[in-house]
Regions:
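Extended, histidine- and acidic-residue-enriched regions that form the cofactor-binding/catalytic faces
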Residues: 1-40, 48-193
Length: 193
């Protein structure tokens, strides 16, 4: 579990890889899949810092007409449900991620510390947070929150996490089915007009 995370480097234990190294590694192993006849790949991703880099790799592979690779993030597949379930969601360490882990790996969540995490973080995070005159003024998570947490984790439960997991799984299955139904040539870049 390592990705493009320099924006979290101020928090103990954060490990990250240089963006170019990450892209080259992902591209290399994806090309290996192509060697074995696989022509479609879904990168199942759970880290916002990886999104643009996975998409860049997908673009390179598609432009080379090697294979079609797309990035999928579980919470982006179910935004309405996430919005419905949580009053104060957040993009990092918030209730959606906490609830999902409470469902999948409850032993990793310290329920007795959720209020502390919330209180040391930023409960409300919106389009105006960390912006001045339309420009993002932050580069690192610590610029907005002392502990890296955004949202109110005390709203998380394993039951909510199960709802999110089941809904996201349905979306991933539907994406796999859609991708399998596509003609490979229709997934490639179109000719110049």
């Amino acid at each position: 579990n390592i990705g493009v995370s320099p924006h979290h480097r101020q928090f103990h234990g954060t490990m990250w890889v240089d963006p170019a190294t990450f892209r080259d590694y992902v591209e290399s192993f994806t090309r290996n899949l192509s060697y074995h006849g696989i022509d479609r790949v879904i990168y199942v991703n759970a880290h916002g810092g990886n999104v643009e880099h996975l998409r860049e790799v997908g673009r390179r592979l598609r432009d080379d007409e090697e294979l079609y690779a797309i990035e999928w993030m579980w919470n982006e597949s179910i935004p309405e449900l996430v919005e419905e379930v949580f009053e104060h969601n957040g993009p990092h360490g918030g209730p959606k991620e906490t609830a999902l882990i409470q469902h999948l790996r409850p032993e990793l969540v310290h329920d007795d510390r959720l209020a502390e995490a919330r209180d040391g973080g930023l409960t409300r995070f919106d389009a105006e947070t960390g912006r001045q005159h339309g420009a993002r003024t932050f580069y690192d998570a610590i610029d907005n929150t002392d502990n890296g947490v955004l949202g109110d984790q005390t709203d998380a439960t394993a039951a909510k996490g199960e709802r999110l997991f089941d809904a996201a799984t349905e979306q991933l299955v539907a994406l796999c089915e859609w991708l399998g139904d596509q003609q490979f040539t229709e997934l490639l870049p179109r000719d110049h007009v």
